[in-house]
């Protein structure tokens, strides 16, 4: 049957159909191969936007640096990064004038956070550039490695566990003439296999100590590693994103804490809130502008787009902003906040893996690492790559490119929002001193601008003034990609506003379906997604019921758990039929055990185990909720778990779902192929750290400690705790004398071993 798609829309208002035009169904595009080319693009573009700035050389690292601040004022509409310091400071001053006490209060809040934050804050976050191994690592491992190296170089302030003390170590490490690090390496040798008599390659992992001089250490400390951003929809080209190392992370965290605190107090800021709270905030600004534009006034809204926001921002401007925001604050506080922008003014971008060459004729492949790009003959590359390399060569040092101007993606979202809002704030009539005035919304690089004026000329003049004011602080509104409409219809951060926000349901599409964690979590996440969309995204009851049926179908096909009385044959059907036949109360079987689905749109908030508990056979209950079941390795049992769901744009968001741990909550084991690579040593370190933490938690009831960082302080704590506990147990008669003396002996042995090490 042919369906003419336009018929579907006859009854749908146009603004509700917009979501069907989004590129959000199906798999998003992923990148393969290296990100080196994308990173070079970023570095070259950033320098191009600031090319009329001043060149200097960093005295410590020898890196050439371009400073566009207070550079020439733009004469055309091309994007440029020539922010003017005095303009930025003035915008800050006016922002403070309109919000008395805002900076002062935010500083006080931040100071409290700075003094209380623990080092383990840095274990949050995924991939982090690990400077000791010169590659990316999970955040916790990278932090442990950094602290381990600090300790072996006599830097121990961090053992207090406070983040601020760790940052003191970071500062001191930069003054050291050299630093000793431990690296992992791999030896290969050919040996004959006894069994098969064939030659095989045997790999052994070694650790070696290596000394790094001050210059090399500084380069590593200032390095941002780069990767390609994956799963970006609606784009033809990929782009590079940055992962900073541990030295930078802590300082950035404090700056962003301050900026977040300011954003929370600004009505035009789309950060840090999200979801319905954000919609309410936005609706308020629109309402204000529409009520104030009396019948005599026109009101227009620009759905704004900025050209290359990050590449035209400048860390030196952020330094100026922080200096202004923290005036009158204690010296130590001002210093700690100014370090992040200073480090970013001296940052180096690591070019990634380099290029892969292959010869079709000789079936050979070879990797050209980024370090070689400075010296390799360019005849091997195609035209466009050759141009990129030629351009970037003067900036290269040890396979990293000096990148002083520009901010890499996602580093200072909050602070750059403060800058954007400060320009929106200048639109008040008392500042424009004329008949037009503006207001708007800002969320990182996305903005919506609402301009009111008595006539069209006034609107045009207002937009022009906004455009030029932005240029003065390094913000480039794109005239090609921004569009203007009568107020009441616009888009901001993918929220579509049409006299109120329209649900953009297509954005949620990717998060429907089976997540693939395990049977228990998948069922729970699936129904929670449907429930959340009924609450937040206008998912109607009929559609929700259909979504639920499709989800159950999908779930059964994924886990091959069709109902016990079905005719469908799968690998599991024999076992499931057997279970079905011997179960008295068949309604009590979970869907993943071939039971019926009891969910409907009214009971989506109840975990399946709870929904069916009363209906289950007793022996089934006993098997299902049995912590001693040998086939299941359990996570800690928490009542609420977090799932990562993929909305269509923006980062993966965390979604809470009810977690009832059953024998279906299994955890898949890690892929073994990593065990044959040079990363094996790293993996062993990570497991060792994990084991040590678990052991530590056995010693200390969870209330009495905060998770420690680094291994040696943990050992001391456990030994002394063991001694105290043993003495108490011995004196109260819970353990015998022999046991007591054995424990004491073990403790002494451990201490002896540590002294020898």
Curated annotation (Swiss-Prot):
One of its GO terms (cellular component) is host cell cytoplasm. It holds the Pfam family Flu_PB1. GO terms for biological process: DNA-templated transcription; symbiont-mediated suppression of host gene expression; symbiont-mediated suppression of host mRNA transcription via inhibition of RNA polymerase II activity; viral RNA genome replication; viral transcription. It is found in: Host nucleus; Host cytoplasm. It catalyses: RNA(n) + a ribonucleoside 5'-triphosphate = RNA(n+1) + diphosphate. Keywords: Eukaryotic host gene expression shutoff by virus, Eukaryotic host transcription shutoff by virus, Host cytoplasm, Host gene expression shutoff by virus, Host nucleus, Host-virus interaction, Inhibition of host RNA polymerase II by virus, Nucleotide-binding, Nucleotidyltransferase, Phosphoprotein, RNA-directed RNA polymerase, Transferase, Viral RNA replication, Viral transcription. Phosphorylated by host PRKCA. GO terms for molecular function: nucleotide binding; RNA binding; RNA-directed RNA polymerase activity. Signal peptide: none annotated. Gene3D superfamilies: 6.10.140.720. Residues 286-483 form the RdRp catalytic domain. Residues 249-256 are annotated as: Promoter-binding site. Residues 52-82 are annotated as: Disordered. PROSITE patterns: RDRP_SSRNA_NEG_SEG. Its main location: host cell. RNA-dependent RNA polymerase which is responsible for replication and transcription of virus RNA segments. The transcription of viral mRNAs occurs by a unique mechanism called cap-snatching. 5' methylated caps of cellular mRNAs are cleaved after 10-13 nucleotides by PA. In turn, these short capped RNAs are used as primers by PB1 for transcription of viral mRNAs. During virus replication, PB1 initiates RNA synthesis and copy vRNA into complementary RNA (cRNA) which in turn serves as a template for the production of more vRNAs. Belongs to the influenza viruses polymerase PB1 family. Influenza RNA polymerase is composed of three subunits: PB1, PB2 and PA. Interacts (via N-terminus) with PA (via C-terminus). Interacts (via C-terminus) with PB2 (via N-terminus); this interaction is essential for transcription initiation. This is RNA-directed RNA polymerase catalytic subunit. It comes from Influenza A virus (strain A/Kitakyushu/159/1993 H3N2). The lineage of its organism: Viruses, Riboviria, Orthornavirae, Negarnaviricota, Polyploviricotina. The gene is PB1.
